[in-house]
């Protein structure tokens, strides 16, 4: 009984996906080798993993020569105004630039994974020390940047505090000025009221001042002969003294 048809789709489990990739990659490299040996074919195989790691196989001594042959067959002969030698030099230069960029890309990918704590197994002790120094330098730079940011924020807050203190001082001076003016107005009003009250008392004292009574130096006591019930009034004549008491 044969195997059933396997549905081709992405393996969701990360571990299973890595295992499947390793098995299929090894099988693919083996098939390429067998094809080159059995059929005397020129085979070049390039595989990049999902993490950017390169796997390659070439049946000849140089991958670059196989790629040059591929470009010649795929893109055709160069233009008429360009000689074959110049075209070859241009292709070689392009291939070298491509290889440099590829190596740079792979190096950056490895560095990124190492900084994230991945793929540390192949690293030597010296590489790990170098990575540790890089991380320490990065941490120092991050802390320095954070400290400078906090100092800038502190400076801004201090400037705002100074402006608020100046505004508060100006408001306090204005309030003190208002209080002094209000106190002066109250004192002026009290002085005016006291002056009117004192003037009224003085005028009342003048109204109710006791006038001196003029009196004669002599006093007569008795009755007139004509009117026994009437009191004898005082007069200037000495002959009238006590006239009512005489027979």
Swiss-Prot record:
GO terms for biological process: positive regulation of transcription by RNA polymerase II; regulation of DNA-templated transcription; tissue development. GO terms for molecular function: DNA-binding transcription factor activity; protein dimerization activity; RNA polymerase II transcription regulatory region sequence-specific DNA binding. Disulfide bonds: none annotated. It comes from the Eukaryota. This is MADS-box transcription factor 1. Residues 91-181 form the K-box domain. The keyword Secreted does not apply. Its main location: nucleus. The keyword Nucleus applies. Signal peptide: none annotated. GO terms for cellular component: nucleus. Probable transcription factor. Keywords: DNA-binding, Nucleus, Transcription, Transcription regulation. It comes from Pisum sativum. Residues 1-61 form the MADS-box domain. InterPro entries: MADS-box/MEF2_TF, MEF2-like_N, TF_Kbox, TF_MADSbox, TF_MADSbox_sf. It is found in: Nucleus. Expressed abundantly in the seed coat and to lesser extent in young buds, carpels, petals, and stamen. CDD domains: MADS_MEF2_like.
């Amino acid at each position: 009984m044969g195997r059933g048809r396997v549905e081709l789709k992405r393996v969701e489990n990360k571990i299973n996906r890595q295992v499947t990739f390793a098995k299929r990659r090894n099988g693919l490299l083996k098939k390429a080798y067998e094809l080159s040996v059995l059929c005397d074919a020129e085979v070049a195989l390039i595989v990049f993993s999902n993490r950017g790691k390169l796997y390659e196989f070439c049946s000849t001594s140089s991958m670059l020569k196989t790629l040059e042959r591929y470009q010649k067959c795929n893109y055709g002969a160069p233009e008429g105004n360009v000689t074959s030698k110049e075209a070859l030099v241009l292709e070689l230069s392009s291939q070298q630039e491509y290889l440099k960029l590829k190596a740079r890309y792979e190096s950056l990918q490895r560095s990124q994974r190492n900084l994230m704590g991945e793929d540390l197994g192949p690293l030597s002790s010296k590489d790990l020390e170098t990575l540790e120094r890089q991380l320490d330098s990065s941490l120092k730079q991050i802390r320095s940047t954070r400290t400078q940011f906090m100092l800038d924020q502190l400076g801004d807050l201090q400037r705002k505090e100074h402006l608020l203190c100046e505004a508060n001082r100006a408001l306090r001076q204005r309030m003190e000025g208002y209080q002094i003016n209000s106190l002066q107005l109250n004192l002026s009003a009290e002085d005016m009221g006291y002056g009117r009250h004192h003037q009224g008392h003085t005028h009342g004292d003048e109204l109710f001042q006791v006038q001196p009574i003029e009196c004669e130096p002599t006093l007569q006591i008795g009755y007139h002969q004509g009117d026994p019930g009437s009191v004898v009034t005082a007069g200037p004549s000495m002959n009238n003294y006590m006239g009512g008491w005489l027979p």
